[in-house]
Amino acid sequence: MSLMRNMNRALTATTGLQVRRAPKRQPGPVTKAPEKKTPAKRPAPEYRCTDDPATDRLLRRPVFIMSPVRSGSTLLRMLLDAHPRLHAPHELHIRRLEVDYGSTLSRRAMDALDLSRGDLEHLLWDRVLHRELTRSGKDFIVEKTPSNAFVYRRIRDCWPDARFVFLLRHPVSIAQSWHEGDPDKRTYEEACADALRYMKAVDNARKGITGGHTVRYEELTADPERRLRALCTYLGVDFEPAMLDYGARDGTQVQKGLGDWRDKIRSGTVQAGRPLPKDDEIPEVLRPMCEAWGYLK
């Protein structure tokens, strides 16, 4: 008689229970993990163009650098920030500051003041920039967030007296730098496509805004004093030699993760740009932009 039978006889006599082998469990149906849904893009709010800037805005004649990623905007803002009248902080990303209503009553109250959600956002943007400028003690603020180019109309409408600086660079150099900044995140081909979105946005802004000033990265690094003198003339300020030695100040102007903070920027002086690619080295996807910006004949 087996051990199991003896155990069951004794167990049954004392408890009335028996031990049985559990049946093999059949595998259940395979269920797929639920797909992550990308949240719907929030529609751009309506707003009115101010007809009374003296009342609606605290900021006067702000400066916006419209540039693609990796086009030298951090270098340019460091040079401008060394001017005693120009305050050029790190990227502020004001377009991502949004306003919403906590209740129907708050919406109705703002409607009664003729303030839509877009108008309230403009008031917020203006206050943030004005606060930063006031803290600096300077006269004009310079904002250089690359994604501003995607909403250039809102920025133009928010500050009717704004000045715009368009910073251009060879599209291939932009794509190479964008890829090298994080090669594990994006291939060179992906960097070309992604950077091209910013280039197109800047190109649209350049066509849609009158009276701006264009600076080319290659010319800025080759002859910084000449290009800065021309830019200062456009901005209505005197050229200051200290702009060429922006590194003489402390290092608080560089914030890791906000703009370019690599050694080339931290050197404190303008460094030579990378050699330009030959025409046959330009990827097909970038050739139209190279031609539009005068880098390909």
Question: PLM features: residue spans?
Answer:
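Charged, low-complexity, helix-prone segments enriched in Lys/Glu/Asp/Gln
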Residues: 17, 118, 125-129, 194-199
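Secondary-structure transition/capping residues
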Residues: 18-22, 87-90, 166, 185-186, ...
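PAPS-dependent sulfotransferase catalytic domain
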Residues: 94, 101-106, 135-243, 252-265
